[in-house]
Amino acid sequence: MELVMKDAKSALEVSETTFGREFNEALVHQVVVAYAAGARQGTRAQLTRSEVSGGGKKPWRQKGTGRARAGSIRSPIWRSGGVTFAAKPQDHSQKVNKKMYRGAIRSILSELVRQERLIVVEKFGIEAPKTKELIAKLKEMELTDVLIVTAEVDENLFLAARNLYKVDVRDVAGIDPVSLIAFDKVLMTADAVKQIEEMLA
C-alpha cells in the first residue's frame, strides 16, 4: 500500500501488515489500560493500628468504670488511631507481551491511516529552537492538536514544542499506544515511517 506525502508529489510504499491492518479494539484497549496502569506510582501508604506509635497500655481497666471497654488508644475507632483497611504501596503494572504490544501499535497506525489522521512528510524541522517558528509551520499545515514523530531526536523541535499545549515531539523509540491515540493528528517523517516498519517487522 502507499501513503501520500503531504510535502512531495510522490507516495511512500509501506507494508500492509503495519499500516493496513484491521482495527482490534479489544487488544488496543487492553494494551492502553496496561500502559496507563504501569505509569501509576502506587506509593500511597497509611498506618494500621499495629503501625501507629503508642497504644501499648490499656487506657483503663476492663470492668467497673462504666465506660466502654478499650484495649488501645490506637484502635481505628479512636481519634489518632490506625486505619482499618490501610492503603499500602501497590504495583499496578500488568503484563503485556511483545507480540500484543506490537499488534496494538500496528492496529492504531492502521486506524490512523483509515481515519486520515496520519500525515506523512518528507522532512520536518525548524532552523532554531523557536516556538514562534514551530507555531507558524504548524499553522501553515492547519495543525493544532498534533504528535510529531521524527526518526531521530530533534533538539530544536523538542525545545520549541515544550511549551505548547496539544503539541508533542517524539522520536520513534519514544512512541507508545497512549501518545498515538491522544492527539487529533500524527505527523511523521518518511524516515520515521520506515523506522517504525523495521521495528514492527
UniProtKB/Swiss-Prot annotation:
Lineage: superkingdom: Bacteria
Asked if the record carries the keyword rRNA-binding, the reply is: yes
- Cite a single GO MF annotation: structural constituent of ribosome
What InterPro entries does this protein map onto?
Ribosomal_uL4, Ribosomal_uL4-like, Ribosomal_uL4_dom_sf
Q: Where is this region: Disordered?
A: 45-66
Q: Which family does it belong to?
A: Belongs to the universal ribosomal protein uL4 family.
**Partners and quaternary state?**
Part of the 50S ribosomal subunit.
Q: Which HAMAP family match?
A: Ribosomal_uL4_B (MF_01328_B)
Per its database record, what is this protein's job? Answer: One of the primary rRNA binding proteins, this protein initially binds near the 5'-end of the 23S rRNA. It is important during the early stages of 50S assembly. It makes multiple contacts with different domains of the 23S rRNA in the assembled 50S subunit and ribosome.
Q: What is this protein called?
A: Large ribosomal subunit protein uL4
Organism encoding this protein: Aeromonas hydrophila subsp. hydrophila (strain ATCC 7966 / DSM 30187 / BCRC 13018 / CCUG 14551 / JCM 1027 / KCTC 2358 / NCIMB 9240 / NCTC 8049)
